[in-house]
Amino acid sequence: DYAGGANPSPAYYQDLPSYFLADTDGPDYEGAYIAQENFINNGQINWNRIYDANLTNNQANLNAAYVLYEDRVDDTQLTINSAYNREINENIKVTASANYRNLVSDNFAEISDMLGGYSYSNIDSFDYLDYNLLSPNSIVSEGDKFKYHYKMNAEEMSLFSMINFSFNKLEFYVAGDITNTTYQRDGIFENEANAGNSAGKGDEISFDGYGVKAGITYKFSGKHILDFNSAYLQKAPSIRNTFTNSRVNHNVVGSDINGLINDSPITEEKIMSFDANYIFRTPIFTGRLTGFYSEVKDANEISFYYAD
């Protein structure tokens, strides 16, 4: 992090040739050439400059300009599975299972090295907003959490069953499952830019889904086999694709602090698929011809961008 210094990355966009070539007043070829040479000859982070900046700030009783930190995700998970299998007769087999999973995910940034500095400010240097109003204007150092801190609680319960039928030339199966998934964000920091929507527990987000699968295989002979499968599934979106910016607020996709946006709440993903296979065997080789169709609805993906 570089709250008190310039971006130390040699690949910072304002130091690359493309930045000068995209100048609104026309391409700056001289600047682009100089940037290219600097990148070729000095393409590594200048650690000496970073340490010098922090040591200079120490002498002036200022906070460090640079620190090294890591984004941490510490998960604690409990999983319970139960399975049941029974052979009704030589032609019919039944499988069933029940599953429970509980996840507590602790997410935070932690300073791992002060890079010669003594202290660091837990303030966003871009807009001068506090990262944690619960401890305003705090000073942090190595081993301290800063920038963001929240926990994500997730719980999933599911039931699954499948029945298989097997005869001389014909095999087929039918399977189904139901699943309930819940997410809840618990903010440890109160981000000033999201005050009132950052600390504490947010709303519990719940998803109910089900799935149905079926398939049939017909063996004309040991050399020629036809196989068909179909499925319709509903599944909860991932945690990442449910919350728009979980590091700093409780907002979920399709809503903000004021409620729903365009009356479009986030919902389960719907997946429909079919496939058909023809398998043939000869003494020389084995081949397979496959055709398939898949359709996904109500899926979403969170992306981020930087605006200068």
Please provide the spans of the model-predicted regions.
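Outer-membrane beta-barrel domain signature, strongest for Gram-negative TonB-dependent receptors
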Residues: 1-104, 109, 286-288
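Conserved glycosyltransferase catalytic-site signature
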Residues: 77-78, 157, 271-272
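Residues on the lipid-exposed face of transmembrane beta-strands in outer-membrane beta-barrel proteins
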Residues: 80-86, 96, 159-165, 214-218, ...
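Short loop/turn positions at the edges of beta-strands in beta-sheet-rich folds
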Residues: 88-90, 220-222, 270
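Short acidic-glycine motifs
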Residues: 77, 301-306
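Signature of Gram-negative outer-membrane beta-barrel scaffolds
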Residues: 65-67, 93-221, 241, 251, ...
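N-terminal presequences and immediately downstream first alpha-helices
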Residues: 87, 226-228
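Outer-membrane beta-barrel signature, preferentially recognizing the C-terminal barrel domain
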Residues: 148-152, 202-211, 224-225, 232-297, ...
